[in-house]
Amino acid sequence: MNSTRNIISLVRRYSTSRSVKIASHGSPSTALKIENENITDKISNKDVLVEMLHAPINPADLNIIQGTYGTNVQVGGVAGMEGVGVVKKVGSGVTGLKENDLVVPSMKQHFGSWRSKGVWSEQQLFKVPSDIPTEYLSTISINPTTAYLLLNDFVKLQQGDVIIQNASNSMVGLSVIQLAKARGIKTINVIRDGSEFEDNVQRLKQLGGDIVVSEEYVRTPAFRKLISDLPSPKLALNAVGGQSATELSRILADNGTLVTYGGMSREPVTIPTSQLIFRNIQIRGFWLNKWFEQHTDSEKQSVYDAIFDLIRKKQFKLLIEKHKFSEFDQALLKSQQSGHGRKIVLDLQL
């Protein structure tokens, strides 16, 4: 009888978690492996057992797998920078969280969100409200937060001001459009030409983009005429680099600021000397990981609250395409295809 109780007790202490691990650094299609592992319910006093609900596949996740990101995740680590989960159990020393709370990563270090269940310390988790859709919460830490900080941390923008950005149909770009619209800031949005160009133009304008043009059109006199009635942009947001970044700098107002937060073209940001000397164009860089390292939880909460408020007012939405965790390979492939205009989010319980 006692042995039977021990077996039952043992079964109750363990559950299986499926996770996506980095087997090697290289192409995401070959560098990952899916494993099942046992997760114990017996956790230390400062730890929290979390059942993960959703996690997106971000470009930064793919860069980490490739070994080309600014931070390195060791081989054998679980992939995924952000996501959302529900607290299932807390250690005796945990004071800020309780069962059934929703949590996202604190973003102080790599999280490893592509798993169905995991144990983290309380300091690695950040509580979020339950009235926001969980698929939205899973993406809040990176793209919307980046967009918010780009609009707030570099130039003092007021209603009626103008900004210009490339990669405008990225998730950061779509977030910038909506956050700017909510503040009465006009956006000039540059996107790549291609078979989905007209669909992307329609999508961006529906979200509030004022002007949407192709990379090629920006270089024409017709573009200058198109924007001639607008104030010159005070801020340019660059996620591409190369010639695209150069063109953004030429459109900026004198004393304007070009902020680079990505390099999709893998080409250097090259600004003509005349832009620096005669027009005092400011060149800045932004890396979200560094921002999280240097700012407090209270400052992070303020950013999240501002975004949550717009979501509640239906002034901000995320274009999301959900995929079952059991169909991870298809989701990974879709995330690497350009032009679909939606964030791929894993449903980690399916």
From Swiss-Prot:
Major localization listed first in the record, in broad terms: mitochondrion
Transit peptide: 1-14
Gene3D superfamilies according to UniProt: Medium-chain alcohol dehydrogenases, catalytic domain, NAD(P)-binding Rossmann-like Domain
Residues the entry annotates as binding NADP(+): 143, 169-172, 192-194, 261-264, 286-288, 343
Gene Ontology cellular component annotations, sorted alphabetically: mitochondrion
SUPFAM superfamilies (UniProt xref): GroES-like, NAD(P)-binding Rossmann-fold domains
This protein's UniProt keywords: Fatty acid biosynthesis, Fatty acid metabolism, Lipid biosynthesis, Lipid metabolism, Mitochondrion, NADP, Oxidoreductase, Transit peptide
Pfam annotation, one family: ADH_zinc_N
Domain of life: Eukaryota
GO terms for biological process, alphabetical: fatty acid biosynthetic process; fatty acid metabolic process
Catalytic machinery residues: 69 (proton donor)
SMART domains the UniProt entry points to: PKS_ER (SM00829)
One MF annotation (Gene Ontology) recorded for this entry: trans-2-enoyl-CoA reductase (NADPH) activity
Compartmental location: Mitochondrion
Record field: transmembrane: none
EC supergroup of this enzyme: oxidoreductase
Catalytic activity: a 2,3-saturated acyl-[ACP] + NADP(+) = a (2E)-enoyl-[ACP] + NADPH + H(+)
Subunit structure: Homodimer.
Chain's role: Catalyzes the NADPH-dependent reduction of trans-2-enoyl thioesters in mitochondrial fatty acid synthesis (fatty acid synthesis type II). Fatty acid chain elongation in mitochondria uses acyl carrier protein (ACP) as an acyl group carrier, but the enzyme accepts both ACP and CoA thioesters as substrates in vitro.
UniProt family annotation: Belongs to the zinc-containing alcohol dehydrogenase family. Quinone oxidoreductase subfamily.
Protein name per its UniProtKB record: Enoyl-[acyl-carrier-protein] reductase, mitochondrial
Originating organism: Dictyostelium discoideum (Social amoeba)
Origin organism lineage: Eukaryota, Amoebozoa, Evosea, Eumycetozoa, Dictyostelia
